[in-house]
Amino acid sequence: RKLEELKYKKVFTRSKKDLDLRDQKKVLKYLSTIKPDAVILAAAKVGGIEANNTLRGEFIYDNLSIQNSVIHSSYLAGVKNLIFLGSSCIYPKLSKQPIKEKYLLSGYLEKTNEPYAIAKIAGINLCESYNIQYNLNYKCLMPCNAYGINDDYDPIKSHFFPALIKKIVDAIRYRKKAIYIWGNGKPLRELI
């Protein structure tokens, strides 16, 4: 969206209802038709602690399906450049702070979002493996937690910060004296 806003001329996007990224045949047809110079893979099934913990199978299956479909279809369509957005949750639960890239796979993952994290780690490895085998330029970026316009503020499905904002707004609106926040207050979050 930002690239379109900046008036880039050849930016192709599709909504979830326009193109199911889990469907490799449709993704390959789409990429073969538009022949992009690069693909930015930011799509994922995401959610907060409650969603990650109760929809574990959906999170790992859908994310692996999206990643495998888009990355492999990009290769088949001749796309040499791809950016894959990973997640900060790929790092160990008890990782030293601030988190460094070398801490990846150095400890246990947070159990509540382990299926999502494992899918993201698999996507990183898939990009690295395709780079080696097929001489591609597939890069993996690990953004910190982002929030803002079009975020999901649902108290069950959203990530920590949007949920916190909603709780504070609701507390002010309904004149509540306190808000309830899950956890023990020790986890650190990086936000943009």
What are these regions (language model features)?
Residues 1-2, 6, 73, 126:
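Rossmann-fold NAD(P)-dependent oxidoreductase module
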Residues 14, 39-45, 82-88, 141-143:
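SDR active-site strand-loop-helix element
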Residues 68-113, 139:
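Conserved Rossmann-fold NAD(P)-dependent oxidoreductase catalytic core, especially the SDR/UDP-sugar
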Residues 94-103, 128-191:
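NAD(P)-dependent short-chain dehydrogenase/reductase
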Residues 115, 119-122:
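Active-site helix of classical SDR
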